[in-house]
Amino acid sequence: MEPDDSQLSDILKDARIPDSQDIGVNLTQNLSFDTVQKMIDGVFTPIFSQGTEDSLEKDILKTPGISTIYNGILGNGEETKKRTPKISDAFEPDLNTSGDVFDSDKSEDGLMNDESYLSNTTLSQVVLDSQKYEYLRVRTEEEQQLVIEKRARERFIRKSMKIAEETALSYENDGSRELSETMTQKVTQMDFTETNVPFDGNDESSNLAVRVQSDMNLNEDCEKWMEIDVLKQKVAKSSDMAFAISSEHEKYLWTKMGCLVPIQVKWKLDKRHFNSNLSLRIRFVKYDKKENVEYAIRNPRSDVMKCRSHTEREQHFPFDSFFYIRNSEHEFSYSAEKGSTFTLIMYPGAVQANFDIIFMCQEKCLDLDDRRKTMCLAVFLDDENGNEILHAYIKQVRIVAYPRRDWKNFCEREDAKQKDFRFPELPAYKKASLESINIKQEVNLENMFNVTNTTAQMEPSTSYSSPSNSNNRKRFLNECDSPNNDYTMMHRTPPVTGYASRLHGCVPPIETEHENCQSPSMKRSRCTNYSFRTLTLSTAEYTKVVEFLAREAKVPRYTWVPTQVVSHILPTEGLERFLTAIKAGHDSVLFNANGIYTMGDMIREFEKHNDIFERIGIDSSKLSKYYEAFLSFYRIQEAMKLPK
């Protein structure tokens, strides 16, 4: 009951409640003394918090004889509780829990077993009766059951969302529908009876679980794919490009430098990426046949580099790019962080992109190692974070001078089984072995200059080399190309490059003649034959040559110092004088390693192998000096053996 005005005036007169207008100088101090006296008499009990009570207890008990006063002021322990009460009616029953129910540091089982929680309400709030409180009590069975059901529903939702994320990730990486169906079936067949939770369709958490299942089924039914095609009908000239798809769904493109190639890229995504900001990356890479294409298109160091000549003449930026984007309906940019890449910015909801590609270099400009590799055009579809979603590529791209003609000649013929045909670096007849192109017939020396025999031998070649009409020329080419034909084209034997043999005089010099080489691209093909044979000396002829050279070696040669020195060396001497004469004394280790210690040993090895110095490992720059000195010594020794 609130006091009226008359009662308030009486209280003010008694100085129990001071008035702000009548406060004197010492009124506050007197009031404090009166309050302390009332506390000592037990009339007034102050309001203390739990911390204040503990601190007062420590300070007051230090003074002797004050324990009785302390008990009167604070009362006994039964009246003032050490535990603070909790709020019971401040919120709804479902929310009558502490704020740390879903704390990650506490386990769910521990929260389920803890049936009571304490609030942070102080004792002063209870005394002042600011709101309705109820002291600590145990939850009823109905309240506890509601809390258990709510937590079980939340756990089920978290598990469902986790399974949905794992299913979508595995479906994106592996592309396996079986895995997606299995995971979706697991979520659909989850029984709420495991957690004793009644599934209510009107509950918000239950609706969330249904949405999770529907999203998983949507991801399962959506099949992602991406394709890259060349629009052949939009090419300016059909002869500038050839595009084909093999039975293994591998794509091949042969085009011309400076020709616009219309490209169309299509894709299909699930609804998670439908409204995302996507980007399309385009790369032109090279790879070996043994290398995996999937690795090569992602390797930042596998770009095809433009030649120096075209780079210096290029007018578009970047100057060193092998290709450029033209006539694109989307904005694009260039980047070289992860390889030379053109990036097209797609608008949300786009399902295709059309643009033109122009190549500003060609195969013949590249190095030999790069020409032996296969070039590939790859496109990547990335999300807004730069992560790859899908990719597609054209397995082989060739930039040649006549793409359509070369494709017909080398890929559309019946005998062209491999689409990755490469032009030979050398003509076929230069790669053939000497055994297959040399003339296998022996020429008799007596009849060598007989006109009749020579004419008879040249009749087949004359009939072929001088055809009467175009049909004979075609038949001649077919017979030459046929593997079952016995006719073998005649070609000049390459000159012998052995330095020791030519210096020794065993092989005569061969005069080089310009042959009219046969080429399939020539309008009038001719086959020119040359009748010749390699000179082979008999034993008697070889002996005469050696005797002649030995007699010639007796003539003193003052123009070259090593010749004068080796003329005084004996076969029984060591190698020191010989090596010193040619200023190669440090090469004695090579001779000793091969069992050559004297000049006689060197003569013996030379008669076995005329390329003795190449065999023991003499440097090629010193071979001329070695052979000149040793052959002079060898001829002198042979001349000394001849009868006088």
Swiss-Prot record:
Cell compartments where the protein resides: Nucleus
Record note on cofactor: Binds 1 zinc ion per subunit.
GO terms under cellular component: germ cell nucleus; nucleolus; nucleoplasm; nucleus; transcription repressor complex
Gene3D superfamilies per UniProt: 1.10.150.830, 2.60.40.720
Effect of residue 544 to L: Disrupts homodimer formation
GO biological process: determination of adult lifespan; intrinsic apoptotic signaling pathway by p53 class mediator; intrinsic apoptotic signaling pathway in response to DNA damage; intrinsic apoptotic signaling pathway in response to DNA damage by p53 class mediator; meiotic chromosome segregation; positive regulation of transcription by RNA polymerase II; regulation of DNA-templated transcription; response to hypoxia
Binding locations of Zn(2+): 307, 310, 361, 365
SUPFAM superfamilies xref list: p53-like transcription factors
Disruption phenotype: Reduced numbers of germ cell corpses, hypersensitive to the lethal effects of hypoxia, increase in production of males (Him phenotype), decreased lifespan and in extreme cases embryonic lethality. In cep-1 and prmt-5 double mutants, germline cell death and up-regulation of egl-1 mRNA induced by gamma irradiation is prevented. Double RNAi-mediated knockdown together with ape-1 abrogates the increased number of apoptotic germ cells in the ape-1 knockdown model.
Tissue specificity: Expressed in pharyngeal muscle and neurons.
Keywords annotated in UniProt: Activator, Apoptosis, DNA-binding, Metal-binding, Nucleus, Transcription, Transcription regulation, Tumor suppressor, Zinc
Cofactor or coenzyme needed: Zn(2+)
Transmembrane segments: none
An example molecular function term from Gene Ontology annotations: zinc ion binding
InterPro entries: CEP-1_C, p53-like_TF_DNA-bd_sf, p53/RUNT-type_TF_DNA-bd_sf, Trans_fact_CEP1_DNA-bd
Cross-referenced Pfam families: CEP1-DNA_bind, SAM_CEP-1_C
Induction: By DNA damage.
Annotated DNA-binding residue span(s): 223-418
Subunit structure: Homodimer. Interacts (via C-terminus domain) with prmt-5; not methylated by prmt-5. Interacts with cbp-1 (via HAT domain); cep-1 transcriptional activity may be inhibited by interaction with methylated cbp-1. Component of a complex that contains prmt-5 and cbp-1. Interacts with ape-1; the interaction inhibits pro-apoptotic activity of cep-1.
Similarity remark: Belongs to the p53 family.
Purpose: Transcriptional activator that binds the same DNA consensus sequence as p53. Has a role in normal development to ensure proper meiotic chromosome segregation. Promotes apoptosis under conditions of cellular and genotoxic stress in response to DNA damage, hypoxia, or starvation. Regulates germline apoptosis in response to DNA damage. Its pro-apoptotic activity is inhibited when bound to ape-1 in vitro. Plays a role in cell cycle arrest in the germline in response to DNA damage by UV-C light.
Protein name: Transcription factor cep-1
Species for this entry: Caenorhabditis elegans
Lineage, highest ranks first: Eukaryota, Metazoa, Ecdysozoa, Nematoda, Chromadorea
